[in-house]
A protein has these predicted regions:
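Short intrinsically disordered, low-complexity coil segments enriched in acidic
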Residues: 1-2, 211
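Aromatic- and Gly/Pro-rich donor/ligand-binding loops
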Residues: 3-194
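A conserved, positively charged/aromatic
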Residues: 199-210
Length: 211
């Protein structure tokens, strides 16, 4: 891996791999593509973290929970989005406002200050209490910012009308963009339409192959 602001030669590079794993309805193709990426990176010397909907579920299926010696994978939960399309947009807009404040050239804001942002106040009822949602946003952002690279595993997730798949990945790309973490995407199926959201997503990618 090339040197960047997040990497150092004194330790293994930390790579976050994002795939559709941890679903209680097992998706064999998505799981296989994600693990293929993770294994290739681990064999190359990377310290791999898998983003999942359920850490215990993934560790059980993959038989690769992180051990005391540092082997295996670490896990990071997805930031979950509401079902309604308008509410998903409100949530992503609030996340971007939080990121803007976190990366501003001034003292780091408190949770209370972030909760007071108009875009956060506009979040739907399903994401209340707002303090807990903002804490999850900040923890999510800090975890991704600590990575040296992010890899979004291939499949049809960016071509999906299931809102959680696209918006979960858009949120990862947004955090990586603000934190300056290189973002790579393995082969993806793409929709015919090109929305502003997807154009923003692809502009953040360092290497966007398609299938």
């Amino acid at each position: 891996m090339t040197e960047n602001a997040h990497s150092t030669h004194s330790r293994a590079p930390r790579v976050l791999v994002v795939g559709d794993i941890g679903q209680h309805t097992y998706h064999v193709g998505d799981e296989a593509m994600t693990i293929a990426s993770a294994q290739a990176l681990a064999e190359g010397g990377a310290e791999v973290t898998l983003m999942t909907r359920d850490e215990r579920h993934s560790a059980r299926y993959l038989n690769a929970s992180r051990g005391a010696e540092g082997d295996g994978y670490s896990y990071l939960p997805f930031f979950l989005f509401p079902w309604a399309p308008a509410e998903r947009e409100l949530t992503l807009a609030a996340l971007e406002c939080v990121l803007t404040e976190l990366h501003a050239d001034r003292e780091r804001p408190s949770i209370a200050e972030l909760v007071a942002l108009p875009q956060v106040q506009a979040l739907p009822e399903v994401l209340h209490p707002l303090e807990q949602t903002v804490e999850r946003m900040v923890g999510f952002a800090d975890s991704i910012a600590a990575m040296d690279a992010v890899v979004i595993s291939g499949g049809g997730n960016l071509n999906s009308r299931f809102g959680w798949l696209l918006y979960e990945r858009a949120s990862v790309a947004l955090v990586a963009e603000y934190a300056g973490v290189p973002l790579f995407v393995t082969g993806q199926s793409l929709a015919r339409s090109s929305t502003p959201r997807m154009r923003r997503f692809w502009s953040a990618c360092s290497a966007p192959p398609v299938r």
